[in-house]
A protein has these predicted regions:
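Membrane-water interface of transmembrane alpha-helices in multipass transporters/channels
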Residues: 281, 316-323
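Membrane-proximal extracytoplasmic
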Residues: 1-307, 312-313
Length: 323
């Protein structure tokens, strides 16, 4: 990247598990052409990076691009004030939360992971289609993970190695095409979607066979819902939540973009699962409108003050207004 034409300055910030490189180009440089050049250089550097490291570029936005913040939270935090109907989606009498897919969330991590899943897979994709929005950031909660805890004694008893277990988990989470089948002059596409959606599906994944009997993951390991290690959190009114931030495209109008985001969120609310709500916390358009009203008020007051001063000096209202 240092050899790119037009680079004026570079700086980096490195922390545990995170590294950020900022490249500053000349003011006259074309933004999109420079991004293309950086993308090509990142592709060249990718083979030299450690396994599992995937470099990404930031959105086409600036440090002042955050025009709308919102909170994704439970309608009744910790179930306080909620109408409990056991067996139906929502809070249960035992303090757990039942999702519309029938998944029971019993601990803090799984409940926050559910909010993050709603933000990343339901709200964010829809909000990114709004005109003028460069990207949508997520903060707080936990990125959902399925935690597999092998039992060494059971694995030894079945003669299962850790490599076999890892390979079985990888094979059980694939989505592949199987070409097509022709029948009566028609073609039918065949696709095998084996991507994991629940802990039960992981437990049923077959590792190997012993004397013709399949050995599943659930027989040699415990599977739980967990969260990816995080370096930050978000809260509102004393309860942990997930915060979303809409980033404005460079050169866009902050007032119109913020209004469009607010309107889009009203549409998205209809697609949320039961018990989850969106609460706007920052709307840049409100700040802009308040500023415009303040400027207009100051102009009117200033004009009136000038007229009064001119009248005091000239002693004639008509002359003061004309002047």
């Amino acid at each position: 990247i240092a050899g790119l034409n037009g680079v004026e300055n570079m700086r980096s910030l490195s922390r545990n598990g995170f590294s950020q490189v900022t490249v500053i180009f000349k003011e006259s440089s074309n933004l999109y052409f420079m991004r293309q050049q950086v993308t090509e250089r990142l592709a060249q550097a990718r083979p030299n990076l450690p396994a599992g490291v995937e470099p990404q570029m930031g959105p086409v936005s600036t440090g002042l691009g955050e025009v709308f913040h919102y909170s994704v939270e439970y309608e009744f935090p910790d179930g306080k004030g909620a109408k409990v109907k056991d067996g139906e989606p929502g809070w249960q009498s035992d303090g757990s939360f039942l999702t519309e897919r029938g998944e029971r969330l019993t601990d803090r991590v799984s409940k926050l992971a559910y909010l993050r899943t709603v933000q990343d897979w339901i709200i964010r994709p829809q909000l990114r289609t709004t005109a003028g929005v460069a990207d949508v950031d997520s903060l707080g909660g936990y990125v959902k993970q399925f935690v597999v805890e092998p039992d060494a004694a059971k694995m030894a008893a079945y003669g299962i190695s850790f490599e076999e277990l890892a390979q079985a988990l990888e094979d059980a989470n694939l989505s592949v095409g199987a070409n097509f089948i022709r029948r009566s002059g028609e073609s039918y596409l065949v696709r095998a979607d084996a991507r994991i959606k629940s802990a039960d599906e992981i437990a049923r994944a077959v590792i190997a066979q012993r004397q013709g009997v399949p050995i599943t993951v659930g027989q040699v390991a415990n599977i739980n819902v967990g969260g990816e290690l995080r370096s930050g959190a978000a809260s509102r009114n004393g309860y942990e939540t997930v915060v979303g931030s809409a980033l404005m495209l460079v050169g866009a109008n902050s007032r119109t973009v913020a209004q469009a985001v607010g309107d889009k969120l009203e549409e998205i609310k209809k697609t949320l699962p039961p018990g989850v709500v969106i609460v706007p916390t920052l709307n840049r358009s409100q700040l802009v409108m308040a500023t415009i009203k303040t400027v207009a008020k100051n102009l009117v007051e200033g004009a009136a003050l000038v007229v009064v001063i001119l009248f005091a000096l000239l002693g004639n209202w008509r002359a003061a207004v004309i002047a």
